[in-house]
Every structure is written in structure tokens, then in C-alpha cells.
């Protein structure tokens, strides 16, 4: 973890006339406290002609750290006395899961990664890869394998439109690792990633150089998985593959606190001038479409707000809460079933090598494959299929417990993990007193970037939804489940996202074309903290300039007008926008 203070000389923090204490971290050995300046010399936390005082604190007063870190605890979690749980939860994120070792046991039988931090280097955005290897730290890619519904823009860009459904033969987050003797659903050694370069000019007509002669490059990935790589029965047909990278985890608790009412107002406002995803917004009724609602585990309907595809509605049933189960295949009390497919279970039950291994090694009760053992090959095959096919609550539950034993992650451990997940702070903004940064903000707003990258939101009462596992932990300990996780009530936050999906129509674009506007807060620290600054959903943009210009690839891009205006800027104004983006 990087615990160095953000301020150039550990400037005194002034906010509403009071001294703010920097959030502490649990690894002070990496910290470096620099000398302080006289109070009157410090501009941190002070308003100027362009930035308000609040903008130094993008996560709000309760959700911002003054450390150059994506891993620091938020002030609200400290004030609630949750640091011990936060640090324990952090351990579940940072370290490897294994088959049998407490407390991170239960890996497999197939998995996407053996730890969370594999995909989130230093808690940040994944890094661009030239090959797909699940064990590579920094490989934040998830494989997206789907049946394409082909479409074209007016300027000839091919894209895949809704629904472009995921194939059924492998899990939505495909697994490329498995415990012996099982074979991973996809053999990653057969996956190829080829990076291609846009040549000449973009379909929109814009060349790959600015009017002043400065050049830039645009690259994009082409991913191939041959049918021979699938260890399933049946094997998929008519499919395409895309990559989706992880984004930073910090600040997700603050985003969870944005109210549905405020999101609805944002959708209604944008519907007046932009085409919105009809699965999310009914333009005729000026209201949520049926597809905007997500059914939570207790039957509650809530509006989707998380993931690129807007598939999750609550952080407690969102990407992280889901991933701690399906990335590792580690079960908990409310998910006593596997992340697997029937096609994989069938293929493994029909594989002679799998059956033979279990027959030879499974009789001993201490063997990892003992649960699959029986006295005949036919019965082994039957058990393999039945157990690997326990991929729903109906198939699993008590059946899973009878076959595999109790849930592998305790309710307390999961609670600690969610304290950490919700309690991550956003790093404070930097250099807002710099005149170039100030100029960058003015230009950013003037050319229309803030239309989608909405700068700020005001949270209301943070009445987070509670899942069954945390309810069980609270009930067992006489606690109020609605009061034991970090809350971000009544905070002004500056994530630079409208929480709305848009389309850019890039070459080899995201699966359905629709992608939620990614928050910009803290991204300027990525190179320093993770060693890379790759951007966009598949890391195709290696810097801010490339990310912006991908917005102008097609004239039908929702951001074409703003990106074209950026293209037409003088170099000093382009540089100012970049410096602004690196400062917020």
C-alpha cells in the first residue's frame, strides 16, 4: 500500500476552519510524513476562483483520505470504530484463497482468480495485457463470451447490440482455472489477445493527429478463443469474445449512497437531449423501464447502478459482494451453491481422466476429491455431474452442505469484507490551486465533458440494503444490521459520473455497446500507485488523450461533439484538461 501523504509538503488541512486528521492505514511502515508549512502558505482545502473548498474532498468529508492511496480507510469507518473489521476485510481482499487453509478456504472446484487483488492491482484499475493468464497480478480482464447481435453505425462501425446474450456453456465470468483432476471450463493457454492499431483516420473522419501536428495512436484488442479451448458439453457456437477490465474499488460505498430519486432526475434530464438505453429508461413515460429494476435476494426491487452493464443495484449484492463468491467459488451462508454451468458438469462427468483420477485417489477421506468418490465409475460420474451442477440455490442449499460441508466463508468474515469494501476512502484531489489545473476544469466544462462526467452528487440518508449473510451476523450478535456498515449520508461527493450508460461505438466495443460512465475521481494517481494508467473498459487507452479520442471514433458516439471540440483545442488547453484529470 502507498501511504505517502498527498500534499507536496504535508500541507495543513483546512476545512471549515477546523483541522482534519489524515485517515490512518494499517501499514505505517510505508508512510512518509513530510514537513509542514506555515498555515497561511497552504492552499489545500481552500476555495479559489474555479474550485470550491469541497472539491478537495471528492469522497466528501466522511469519505476522503489525504493519503496517496486507494486502500485507506474512510473517516466515517474510523468514527464508527470499524477499523478492526476493515483491516480483517482487507486481508480477504489482498491474500490468496486456498482449498483448505483457514480463513481463506474453499477455492474451486473452478475459479476465475485465486484472490481479489490479482484483478485490482493496488486496489485500482486493471492493467492492459498481451496474453490472458489468470495468475498474473494486474490482469483485471474478465472474458466476455457472447452470441453477437450485429449492427452498424452510419459511418460503418460494426458493433454488437442488445441483447448479445452470454453463452450458456460457461459462467458469465468465465473460469480458466480448476482443481485437479477437473479441467478448467476454458483452457487459457489457447486464448490469444492481439492488439491492433487504427490506421489513417477514424470512421468519423478525424485523423490521428491534431491540427497542430501532434500525433496520437489508438489501439484495440482482438480476442480469440477457439472452440477446442472449451471443456464443456455441448461446446458453444456462434460466439465472440471481448475483454472487460476491473475499475478501482475505492468510492463504491459513496456511489451506493446516491439516491434512486437523484438518479431518476439525472436520467430525465439527459433524456431531453440524449438517446438513453431503452432497457433502463422509458422515454415516452419519462420513467424507469422494466429492465432498470434488479431483484435483490430478499425480493426487493431496486434500480441498477453498478457495473459497466448496470447489472447490480446494491453494493451488498454488487460486484464485490458477488465476486468474493463467484471469482473464487467460495460459498457463504446465503450462497450455498457453486458458480458453474451444467455444460461443464456434464463434460467433467464424461471425462475418463477425471473419473480415473477420482477412482484412484478419492477413497481416502482426507482426499480433496473424496466427496466425488463412489465404488463404480458410473456412480463417480453421477456424483461428479450432480455435485458440479449445484449451481442454483434450488440445486444447492442443504444438498450442497450434505455433499461438501458447511459454507466456507463465515458470516463474520463476510461482514468484515463488506466493512472494508464500503469503507474505502477516495484520495483527495491535488493541485487545485494550480492555474493550469484550473484552466483544465474550465475547458473540460466548456466543451461538454461534464454532460456525462457529472462532477458532483449530494447524498441523502444512506439507507443501504442489507443482505442475508450480514443480517445473520447481526442477529447472532444482537446488532442492528442497518447500522453496522459505513454510511455516507449527506455528503457532497465528486465522482465525475452521471451514473448513466452511453455508447461510444468504438471498434470491438463493449458487448451491447452500452457502458456506464466510469468515475474519474482518483484516476490521476493510477500510474504512481499501480504502475499503469490504462483506461476504458478494456484498457485500450494508455493515457488520457487516447481515452478522449476514442470518444470521437464514430460520429454516432454520444460524446462525439465534446471529443471533437477537444480535438480542435490548442495544445496548451489539451494539456490543461489532462492535468485537470490527473488532479481530481
Where are each of the predicted segments found?
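Bacterial N-terminal signal peptides that target proteins for export
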Residues: 1-10
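Bacterial N-terminal signal peptides
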Residues: 10-18
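C-terminal motif of bacterial Sec signal peptides marking the signal peptidase cleavage site
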Residues: 20-22
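Short, conserved catalytic or interaction motifs in soluble domains
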Residues: 25
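Electron-transfer interface patches adjacent to heme c in soluble/periplasmic c-type cytochromes
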Residues: 28-87, 96-418, 422-435, 446-584
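Conserved short C-terminal alpha-helix that flanks the catalytic cleft of nucleotide-sugar-dependent
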Residues: 93, 443-444
